[in-house]
């Protein structure tokens, strides 16, 4: 409520607004009690920017162009395109090695991972993996890459030895469709979101990295279209973006009347911990689609690209986790469809380009970048981090 009152006060004073600058939009406004948000657009002129990540030193952005079958390099300081590398068909998620030397890119339709030499701006190897690789993370020591293969009848995470640049084994999940993966801050656990086609209760696997075995599967009841997963910095919680269908039909198509809400689910990572499905927006007709996320380094804010609403939604994680900690599982289940909750943890909804499908943060957390799939550009957001 305090945040909402402050935002309303700023709106009345004219401190939040939007100015059309040709094809670009400039937006400024307030976040909580410090800093501001300002959106500008970097034009890439390449079709379908689907995923965005950043070099460890914060100097370069890497944008996977799903329809252009390429990766665009952008200088983060000047916001200018510095290069483009051709990869394989339909690149999606990518990950940079900790030393900043190589970029590993999932080529969904080619069933492969491209290894890009960042300094040379060149693909140096293609590694064949399972069906439809869509998510990838690299271990903190840089020695291993984990690739989520989300084909509808596929249940494997392929493991790549980055020194040899080849697939060495597969880790099998408890159900089909691992879409994205994330590694715990201590490097011991791999979490995979399972977007199993046809299931109304999609789930998350917690995998022991040392043994490669699933140690627990946690169900998100009445969930669909799981998109992304991130850990809190302390490793005690994960956040998962997804939609929740409100009336299931034999043919699950929006034009036949299926209505969704947009959700983020917070899962306590300890065995048997709480699962809190929290709303982001009002009911909609399949146009919300919360996608990629980024957690700021201190765990204060969560940034969510809401692809169908063309904005980044920012949540106050202290308030979100305060709600989870102070409530029983029964209470959380009762509150999960209460849209009134949103005002308690919502910080801001920042307009972007069209269809932000992926977001990333600078290493210091001062800038958020959103890849806008339908407008072929990147929105740069100044955050509230001092």
From Swiss-Prot:
Part of the hydrazine synthase complex that forms an elongated dimer of heterotrimers composed of one alpha, one beta and one gamma subunit. Its main location: other. Induction: Is among the most highly expressed proteins in the proteome. GO terms for cellular component: anammoxosome. This is Hydrazine synthase subunit beta. It comes from Kuenenia stuttgartiensis. Pathway: Nitrogen metabolism. Residues 1-34 form the signal peptide. It is found in: Anammoxosome. Pfam families: YNCE. Component of the hydrazine synthase complex that catalyzes the condensation of nitric oxide (NO) with ammonium to form hydrazine. The beta subunit may play a role in modulating transport of the hydroxylamine intermediate through a tunnel between the gamma and alpha subunit's active site. Keywords: Signal.
